[in-house]
Amino acid sequence: MKRAYTAFIVLGVMVAAFIVASPAYATFPGHNGRIAFQADTGAGNQIYTVRPNGHGLFQVTHVKPAAAGIDPGTSGATTPDWSPDGHWIAFSLNECTVARIHPNGTGLRVVASQTPGGCETDPAFTPDGHHLVFERFDPATNDDAIWIMGLNGEGRRRVGTGPGGAATPEVSPDGQTVTFLSFTPPDDLTAIFAVGIHGGPVRQVTPTLNGITFKHDWAPDGSRLVMSDNAGNPDLPVNVVTIRPDGTGLKYLTDNQTPDQRAFAGSYSPNGKWIVFRQERGDQSALMVMRTNGQGMHAILPFSDFRPRSIDWGPVPS
């Protein structure tokens, strides 16, 4: 995300060692396929996929490192999102360009920006697979908002924004609602907001929970949202929580107790029975899954220096 243009850079700098800005995407109903995520290769980020059993780790993208002046933490290929049919992965290219690619690494498509000097980032598919929602920052107007466009950039339209900008859009499985992250006054902590896909009134869905992390996701049946808490304080543990779209029924799924224990939500599985997330212990990370009630937790990729981020569980290609 081009946080240098918006207040979102403040949070990214404050907790750069704590979280990584990651968009959130709806998981659409289907059979469980491969899990996509970004990881740092030492020369920028790339998109990877892996089977739910931890086998078949595959590097999808091989993009060139960003030019000077772009945050290394967001350069390369970041923020993957699966298309509903499993044939495409949308992602952010070097922070401020929308792109998509087939999961076998072929067919790269880059959407030309229509925001001179600005940023278009964090794409997520709509349930019909024909459109992308994304964050757009226009320095000419200082407008940071959620937009929607066709897969090739056609038919662009502004959807809405929150009290402190808008980031990490996600469309509900029924295609009617877009949720996104925004800063809230007076403490500039992040919360999730919602707006209709055609625009209209914006409402706050979640409490701030000391700052919601950038990644959140809809359950495939639209009944709940998953996210993590405590983005605003690196001296606190991070836990995965779920909530109903009307803001009721907050439920904690993990029970980390110390600041070196951090669970960062990824997404629901397409069959709606699992949640994938990153568990951190100190400087080690593991790709984990658990049932939607927090039970059955186990590792897909064990604890190591390899750090999966912006995790999105895709469907078996139709």
Describe these PLM feature segments.
Residues K2-A26:
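Secretory targeting and sorting signals
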